[in-house]
Amino acid sequence: MDEAAAFLDHVIPRLRDEVVALENGDARPRKGLWSHHDPITLFGAEASASGWDQVEPIFDRLAESFSQGQSCTYDMLGAGVSGDLGYVVAIERSVAGTHGSPPQTFTLRVTTIFRREHCDWKVIHRHGDPYDITSREALNRRRQQGVM
C-alpha cells in the first residue's frame, strides 16, 4: 500500500466518526483529531477561527447545536501526502437534526489539511462551505435561529 492510500485508510474513518459524534452532541472525537499546536485554522461553514484557543469553543458550540447525527459520507475529489503534510478534498454529506428539527442532509465542500505529529495525523486546517442550495438554506436557517 502506498503512503497516500495508508493515509486515507487512517484518516477517512476518523473524519466520518468525528462528524457523526459531533452531530450527536460529542465534540471529543473532533477535538482529538485536531492538533492543539498552532498554527491551526478553521474556515467553517458557520464560524472561522485561528489558534486552538479560538477553535476549541467553536467545536463545543457546534456539538451543542446538533442532534440525531445519523451518518457521514465522503465523495473524494483529491488527496495526497508529502512528508509530514497530507490533505483531503471531498464533498462531505452528513445527516443530523438541529434544535429539535427533524434530521436533514448537510452537504459541504471540505478541504482538510493534516500534519503528522508523533506518528499520528492531526488536522491543522479545515475549510468547509455549503455545496448546494439546500445546504446553504439550512445553514442560513441555523444562523437565523441563533445557533452559531
Q: Which role does the model predict for each range below?
A:
Residues M1-F7, A138:
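A detector for short, charged/polar N-terminal pre-domain segments
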